[in-house]
Design a protein with these regions (language model features):
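A metal-dependent hydrolase signature that marks the N-terminal structural subdomain at the beginning
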Residues: 1-7, 11
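Interhelical loop and helix-boundary elements at the membrane-water interface
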Residues: 3, 16-58, 76, 80-111, ...
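Primarily interfacial, aromatic-capped hydrophobic alpha-helices that serve as membrane anchors
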Residues: 63-67, 113-118
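Transmembrane helix interruption/hinge and helix-loop junction motifs
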Residues: 7, 61-71
Length: 118
């Protein structure tokens, strides 16, 4: 069961956006925000673990909101890649956030169309 079955697509997107904001700001903390970037970490394992930990928190939010472990796993991978791109200087903060929200919109579409069962 997910929010879609109770309130519709807009409420589902809104819930995804709230979960994203919580995981990207208060739940991330200064340490993960810095250490998930390769240039800030003192050893390779530090940035990989930090980026993965942050992406797992994001994945948990998607799983909780959608009820789909598959979408949660998808978020883990996509969030990891998007934040890697930002950390490597491929794009900035605004593009990073727009890409994350585009993923959430894609999850809503997939759920509305019934492509992923929950």
């Amino acid at each position: 069961m997910n929010i879609l079955s109770h309130s519709g697509p807009f409420a589902l997107f809104f819930a995804f956006a709230i979960a994203h904001a919580l995981a990207d700001f208060p739940l991330q903390g200064d340490y993960l925000a810095r250490m998930k970037c390769r240039s800030q970490a003192s050893m390779p394992s530090e940035w990989i673990i930090s980026l993965t930990a942050h992406s797992l928190v994001q994945a948990g939010g998607v799983w909780i909101v959608s009820g789909s472990a598959l979408l949660g796993a998808t978020e883990l991978c996509l969030h990891w890649l998007i934040d890697l791109g930002k950390g490597e200087g491929k794009f900035g903060y605004v593009t990073d956030q727009l890409l994350h929200l585009a993923c959430k919109l894609a999850y809503v579409i997939v759920l509305v169309l019934g492509i992923v069962a929950v």
